[in-house]
Amino acid sequence: VLIRVLLVVTLLIGLSTVGIGWAGADPNALWTIVHDECSPHEEADDDPAPCAVVDTDGGYAVLKDLVGERQFLLIPTLQISGIESPMLLDPGTKDYFADAWRARSLVEERSGRSLPPDWVSLAVNSMVARSQNQLHIHIDCLRADVHQSLTQDADSIGSTWAPFAVPLAGAPYSAVKISDLNDVNVFQLLAEGLPGAREDMSRRTLVVVGSPSGSGFVALAGQADAAAGDEGSGEDLQDHTLCAAPAAGK
């Protein structure tokens, strides 16, 4: 038992020392934690530790990130490298965004209040911007300036991909409305909807936010651009420090 605890602590310390972007972390740390610790613990003891949740039927785990007070990561229990994986474009593979959206309740618990949907965000970074070779969706509050931009230009977002009116966190994004995350694979929506995306998914980043209109969602897609110094980090649209969101209904 002591060896098992020390392994988990070592892995988590490895993640905690890298901060945003996790540069320099063991690229297999997340997979090791979920595959070797969380899933076996859930199966043997009905205890997902060190994860907060392991949903065996759903095929995912949720782990508290050591960066930020409220940030959680949804991680498939199936080994999937990241946004570039062809598996995510297979009709038989789920995209995990609906599961991540339901897991926002953990963010709300840490925030001490229910959060308006348009203040909650889900982000998948590009291959360039990540250091973990296991797909993970960042779940946290949206940055206040990004929320303001999305609210101000909500009417410009339609049912097909189009460039968003202004840069978000200094980077260009395309946006599209989604009515229900249970009815769409957001990775496939990106690959099929933006020219060239299918061929270079590794450079793409995806963010999903509750719609400012109060119904449905907004998906945002960016891409790494070395010339512009853009790594394709959708996580940059999130606020891991201070959640400015009011309580839901206020």
What role is predicted for each listed range?
Residues 1-5:
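Positively charged n-region of N-terminal signal peptides that target proteins for export
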Residues 6-17:
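Bacterial N-terminal signal peptides
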Residues 21-250:
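HIT superfamily nucleotide-processing domains
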